[in-house]
């Protein structure tokens, strides 16, 4: 990530998460996108009322990296690597899925901090101990990772593949409850 940026990928629920994470529709936005994705990003922002795009970084993140400027890196592991870590250390696991997703099934001992509430619950993220972050598939947890990096957190790891990958491991999980019964 570029320092002090929020990483909201075009490949997921882009408009929804822009709306959740950038509450001020007049906020100036400078885009860092893949080459030839600038127009798509501007159009998608505009469709949901974000008309204050002030420009984009030509060449995207690659141009930033090639310029020698600082950037943030997030450690990432898959579910099987988390399983090994879990057997040895029982890490703090923070699940950024919606409460209903968490209530449906989660890793035993995980803490739920939904992504859309992250800024109100930063105190739940330890600064003095490493932790593991995940969502359902990896999209939302990377948004969370960019926000945490922006706010000074460094010692955490993201689970690539999210709970979908974790669910294939022997990590203890709560009993599955159909989400429709939780309404």
Language-model regions, residue ranges each:
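Rhodanese-like catalytic fold shared by cysteine-dependent sulfurtransferases
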Residues: 1-92, 96-183
